């Protein structure tokens, strides 16, 4: 017994050490793809080289980068906007303890402080590929069956990094221009230094325009990126809903708030998606069937989570409660008579289903009204058949006719009026007149992507510009916003391997543990900022009667559609570049 106890302590200690190690330093996986050999690297001239690159390119780790040498980069920005740039460092000799430093950006006596600038080594993760027929859905249990490679994606929080000979290391720079900055041309210097190299400098110039971007909390675009608090507890090996858990959740969720996240993801049943992710969702609400056959409900965890998101994080939109139609139609409860967890197995439309849910929903509505949350709470479903949706809606209406109902799934005319929020898949048709009618009633109409789409997507092998293109498409299509099913459902080894047993690599997360951002998340943020810029400019042009400018904007925006992409005249990167240039010139 004593040996077992000691072993348990040692094992727990090892797990804690592993979690800490993954946060500070780790080795990237080996890329087995063909790459430039020593004979190519020996021809690069100077043994260590540095240049500005493009944010649209994922530079390969073991190839000499194809870049046009540039030591000066010019960017334009609105006040309050975050802009980013990518530099590239490559070397044919080992470098130790390489560091990045970016000082203040100055324009005369005006300053954008260094505290508004962040620099990151871009790290490489393992990815895979699309299915043979396109898309990324389906099981991938055997990783050897898929063409895998290393790709640049994660933005590290490490302060220094060793760089091996014959390798490339991208560097990401982000500047969050203060909302009260003075318009003008600012200049700063990125310095890269380390053992085995002389300090090297790149100049960044930021032309701050006399326009101001709203704060993220005020963006009109409706954003719903599903959160998974259970993944955070597992990765860091901390008890669910403990102080340690919430402390670790806080910076992850703050990243969401900083891109204008609206919705809070809440799970109101055990395994709403049948444990499809590495870390399944538990129910945030306890259910107990008492000895006398009546029910009692424990909202402690639900209340903690919602209060944390609203008050600590500042995400205060729809509380999306999943789900009444899970993948496996088994509904858990604690049975006081047997002192065991039991399950009700019932389909929508059956009496047992109605009894289980009506009783709960009535009490849930009571609790939500007491908390003052009823008006912002929805009972949410995703990708469920029409007949099941009809049956679930009938149960919800019986319990409380005022409950909001949401669906991320196919367009069904028959239930439109019942859906406060509806997100349909990219490429599906949502009639413009229906969207307009829903808007008049205060209903929300959005678009979503998942593993299905070959384009646009945010897999770790997707072109970076696709992440920016996607929310802009939502605005171009007349939608109110964008939904994506997962932002932090981490894999078993998320810092090094983005592949998963189901779906294409990177589908389950774009924020890494740490938390660390990614090229994909930063580009998504770029697109979301553009959406708010478009709204502000449209309002201004309409109020001033600037028809010419409005038409120019709408003409470029109209390209961000499936039809526009099919024409094949521009890549997603070219379209985003064209729009950015226009938004900064109008």
Each PLM stretch: what is its role?
Residues 19-274, 374, 568-586:
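Mature N-terminal, pre-catalytic/accessory segment of carbohydrate-active enzymes
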Residues 330-333, 341, 345-411, 479, ...:
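Catalytic domains of carbohydrate-active enzymes that cleave complex glycans
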Residues 320, 404-406, 446:
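Structural detector of well-ordered beta-strand residues that form the stable sheet scaffold
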């Amino acid at each position: 017994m004593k040996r077992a106890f000691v072993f348990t302590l040692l094992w727990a200690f090892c797990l804690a050490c592993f979690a800490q190690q993954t946060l500070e330093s780790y080795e990237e996986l080996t890329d087995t793809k063909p790459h430039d050999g020593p004979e190519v690297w020996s021809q690069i001239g100077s043994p260590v080289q540095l240049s500005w690159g493009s944010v649209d390119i994922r530079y390969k780790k073991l190839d000499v980068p194809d870049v046009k040498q540039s030591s000066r980069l010019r960017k334009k920005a609105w006040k309050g906007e975050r802009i980013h740039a990518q530099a590239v460092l490559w070397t044919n000799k080992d470098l130790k303890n390489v560091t990045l430093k970016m000082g203040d950006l100055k324009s005369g006596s005006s300053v954008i402080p260094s505290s508004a600038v962040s620099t990151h080594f871009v790290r490489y993760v393992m990815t895979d590929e699309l299915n043979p027929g396109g898309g990324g859905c389906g099981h991938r249990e055997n990783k050897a069956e898929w063409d895998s490679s290393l790709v640049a994606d994660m933005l590290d929080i490490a302060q220094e990094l060793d760089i091996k000979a014959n390798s490339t290391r991208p560097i990401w720079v982000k500047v969050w221009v203060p909302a009260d900055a003075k318009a003008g041309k600012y200049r700063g210097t990125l310095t890269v230094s380390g053992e085995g190299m002389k300090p090297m400098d790149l100049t960044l110039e930021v032309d701050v325009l006399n326009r101001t971007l709203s704060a993220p909390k005020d963006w009109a675009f409706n954003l719903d990126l599903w959160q998974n608090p259970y993944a955070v507890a597992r990765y860091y090996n901390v008890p669910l809903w403990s102080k340690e858990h919430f402390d670790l959740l806080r910076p992850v969720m703050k990243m969401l708030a900083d891109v204008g996240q609206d919705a809070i993801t809440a799970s109101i049943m055990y395994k709403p998606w049948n444990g499809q992710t590495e870390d399944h969702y538990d129910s945030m609400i306890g259910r107990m069937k008492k000895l006398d056959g009546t029910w009692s409900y424990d909202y402690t965890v639900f209340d903690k989570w919602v209060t944390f998101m609203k008050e600590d994080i500042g995400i205060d939109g729809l509380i999306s409660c999943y789900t009444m139609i899970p993948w496996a139609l088994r509904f858990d409860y604690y049975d006081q008579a047997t002192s065991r967890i039991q399950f009700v197995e019932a389909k929508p439309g059956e009496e047992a289903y109605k009894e289980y849910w009506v009783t709960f929903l009535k009490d849930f509505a009571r609790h939500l009204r007491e908390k003052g949350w009823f008006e912002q709470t929805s009972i949410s479903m995703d990708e469920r058949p029409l007949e099941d949706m009809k049956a679930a809606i009938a149960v919800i209406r019986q319990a409380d006719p005022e409950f909001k109902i949401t669906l991320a799934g196919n367009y069904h005319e028959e239930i439109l009026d019942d859906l406060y929020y509806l997100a349909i898949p990219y490429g599906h048709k949502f009639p413009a007149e229906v969207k307009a009618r829903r808007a008049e009633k205060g209903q929300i109409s959005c678009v979503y992507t998942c593993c299905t789409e070959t384009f646009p997507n945010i897999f770790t092998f997707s072109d970076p510009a696709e992440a920016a293109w996607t929310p802009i498409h939502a605005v171009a299509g007349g939608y109110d916003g964008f939904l994506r099913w997962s932002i932090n459902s981490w894999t078993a080894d998320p810092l090094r391997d983005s592949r998963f047993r189901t779906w294409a690599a990177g589908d389950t997360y774009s924020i890494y543990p740490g938390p660390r951002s990614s090229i994909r998340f930063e580009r998504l943020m770029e697109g979301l900022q553009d959406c708010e810029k478009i709204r502000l400019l449209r309002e201004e042009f309409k109020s001033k009667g600037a028809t010419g400018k409005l038409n120019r904007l709408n003409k470029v925006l109209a390209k961000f559609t499936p039809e526009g992409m099919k024409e094949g005249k521009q890549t997603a990167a070219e379209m985003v570049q064209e729009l950015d240039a226009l938004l900064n010139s109008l």
